[in-house]
């Protein structure tokens, strides 16, 4: 990391200690990175380590420089909030890749403990929930997803929603189910959603008979709960006070506190494509709650499945999505992740399902490079780093890819996350 020049004296001793603390954590991160690099490359020689970098392809480096300047400012002053948003499909919904990066980047926060960011209770929608937070629920809920044309709910930035009219409806979330240290907590909860009638209200249960009422913002369509002490779990009940039940819809939960540092948000929906997110009416409105400083775009694996995949249409769809981000965060830095190498499923009548190499990965990689150049962003070329066309077979043989040759195993996602963090850290270290 860049050292502070001699003669720079911070106004308070605490700031000096802060810098030393953050520098120690960053040094630790680099040491762990070196260890991982040695172990991973020895075991998996098919990984093109020389290509593991964030390649800046734009003409104007201002977005990139301003983002890294914000990290520098936080490191030296201990002030400021930096929001990173990682958006994609099933690779991100599983939250192994993204949570690996989240935890590695969290090491840069030093003594500070900013919040976990936005999340969705996937378990309530009866789909796979990340294992790093636990969700349980009561009552009947119906789900809506951005991959479906027929939806009961109006969707926002998460691309998901759950709705209920049940009088016993309840959602419980534990942020640190496997972490004895209890890293993640919040002092402010923003529930994204809406009610069809004033007499249905989400309440935060604090004890056996204690409930916290929210502050409702009709413009942002959020319910905000202010807590007096940090919490690492929540229990939401849907209160029905009318003689008949009314529908309530939840589209996301934003966990916040006032700690400075880097917050790593992740949004993913199984099967989602770029048009899936474009179809969410409240996407831009909800994005204002995050206002990302950097966005990691990892949408594309589903767009490239059809044999008639059009690179031009893919770029045009992305242009439309990126314009939404520019409206909300004009100085946001974009990082594009190329699709992993993959196979597509071929169904044959009266025959077993088989898989066929999807050569569209090459076209998608070209499209991501063009997007990075056009929008002054960087490319993290996962397709090439993992070995290029048909390399997914080697990943499967090594226990890093599932049999469908699309999704990774836990070990594979963790490796991808570590590779990404390594490229991110190297890009930051060599920014000058």
Label the predicted regions.
Residues 59-72, 277-287, 319-321:
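Alpha-helical scaffolding within the catalytic cores
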Residues 294-300, 318-322, 333-338:
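Conserved, well-ordered alpha-helix/loop/beta-strand core segments that scaffold catalytic motifs
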Residues 342-432:
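Catalytic His-Asp segment of secreted/periplasmic serine-dependent ester chemistry enzymes
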Residues 80-83, 260-263, 291-294, 329-334, ...:
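Loop/turn elements at helix/coil->beta-strand transitions in domains of secreted/extracellular proteins
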Residues 29-73:
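Sec-dependent signal peptide cleavage junction
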Residues 93-205, 213-316, 407:
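Conserved SGNH/GDSL esterase-like catalytic core that processes O-acyl groups on lipids
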Residues 1-40, 432:
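Bacterial Sec-dependent N-terminal signal peptides
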Residues 87-90, 266-270, 297-302, 337-341, ...:
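Active-site-proximal beta-strand/loop segments in catalytic clefts of secreted hydrolases
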């Amino acid at each position: 990391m860049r050292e502070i020049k001699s003669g720079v004296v911070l106004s308070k001793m605490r700031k000096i200690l802060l810098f030393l603390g953050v520098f120690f954590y960053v040094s630790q991160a680099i040491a762990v990175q070196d260890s991982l690099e040695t172990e991973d490359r020895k075991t998996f020689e098919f990984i093109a380590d020389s290509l593991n970098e964030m390649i800046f392809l734009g003409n104007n480096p201002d977005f990139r420089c301003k983002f890294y300047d914000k990290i520098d400012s936080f490191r030296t002053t201990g002030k400021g909030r930096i929001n990173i948003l990682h958006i994609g499909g099933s690779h991100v919904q599983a939250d192994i890749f993204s949570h690996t990066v989240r935890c590695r980047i969290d090491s840069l926060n030093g003594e500070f403990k900013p919040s976990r960011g936005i999340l969705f209770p996937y378990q309530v929608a009866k789909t796979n929930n990340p294992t790093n937070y636990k969700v349980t629920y009561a009552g009947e809920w119906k789900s809506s997803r951005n991959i479906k044309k027929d939806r009961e709910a109006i969707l926002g930035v998460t691309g998901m929603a759950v709705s209920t009219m049940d009088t016993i409806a309840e959602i419980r979330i534990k942020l640190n189910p496997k972490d004895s240290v209890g890293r993640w907590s919040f002092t402010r909860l923003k529930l994204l959603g809406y009610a069809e009638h004033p007499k249905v209200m989400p309440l935060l249960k604090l004890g056996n008979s204690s409930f916290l009422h929210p502050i409702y913002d009709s413009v942002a369509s959020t319910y905000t709960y202010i807590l007096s002490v940090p919490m690492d779990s929540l229990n939401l009940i849907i209160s029905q006070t009318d003689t008949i039940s009314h529908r309530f819809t939840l589209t996301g939960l934003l966990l916040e506190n006032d700690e400075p540092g880097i917050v790593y948000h992740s949004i993913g929906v199984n099967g989602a494509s770029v048009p899936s997110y474009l179809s969410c009416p409240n996407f831009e409105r909800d994005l204002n709650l995050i206002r990302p400083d950097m966005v990691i775009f990892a949408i594309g694996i589903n767009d490239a499945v059809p044999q008639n995949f059009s690179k031009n249409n893919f770029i045009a769809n992305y242009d439309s999505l990126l314009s939404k981000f520019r409206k909300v965060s004009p100085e946001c830095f974009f990082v594009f992740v190329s699709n992993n190498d993959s196979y597509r499923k071929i169904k044959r009548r009266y025959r077993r399902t088989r898989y066929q190499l999807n050569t569209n990965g090459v076209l998608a990689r070209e499209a991501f490079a063009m997007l990075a150049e056009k929008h002054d962003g960087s490319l993290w070329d996962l397709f090439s780093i993992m070995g290029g066309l048909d390399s997914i077979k080697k990943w499967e043989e090594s226990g890093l890819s599932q049999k469908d040759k699309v999704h990774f195993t836990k070990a594979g996602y963790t490796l991808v996350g570590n590779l990404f963090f390594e490229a991110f850290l190297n890009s930051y270290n060599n920014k000058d």
